[in-house]
């Protein structure tokens, strides 16, 4: 579903409902993300760069792919929704000085309403994966 930028996030602090799915087809496990998630949230390597607006250690850990159990593990961006770019909160950067010596704010943050979105999507993704794995285990134990 579309999210109206005038209603979602800052400055209105509005909450929206979205969707995250975990699917197993044979040996393939798929996690859908309702936006464009930064690869380091999926694969690891989140940094805490100098100049970030929110000074914190990486929050979106462990990497989501590490919590998947398929032989082939895939993440599909823009799965069922588009809530914006999902940047790690420790890399959130709208105000100078900018990270990585950039002269302007990085591209992604202007398209998401709130820096808390990526930690929420990460945590919910872990919970959805856990439910998938519990369901698969209960089916295999029959």
Task: Name the predicted role of every residue range.
Residues 1-142:
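Non-catalytic substrate/cofactor recognition surfaces at enzyme active-site rims
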């Amino acid at each position: 579903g579309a999210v109206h930028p005038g209603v979602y996030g800052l400055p209105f602090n509005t909450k929206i409902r979205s969707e995250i799915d975990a699917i197993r087809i044979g040996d393939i496990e798929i996690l859908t993300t309702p936006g464009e998630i930064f690869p380091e949230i999926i694969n690891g390597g989140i940094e805490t760069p100098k100049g970030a607006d929110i000074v914190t250690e990486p929050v979106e850990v462990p990497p989501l792919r590490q919590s998947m159990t398929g032989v082939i593990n895939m993440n599909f961006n823009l799965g069922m929704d588009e809530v914006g770019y999902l940047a790690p909160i420790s890399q959130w950067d709208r105000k100078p000085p900018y990270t990585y010596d950039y002269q302007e704010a990085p591209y992604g943050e202007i398209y998401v309403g709130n820096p808390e979105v990526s930690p929420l999507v990460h945590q919910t993704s872990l919970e959805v994966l856990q439910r998938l794995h519990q369901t698969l285990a209960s089916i295999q134990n029959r």
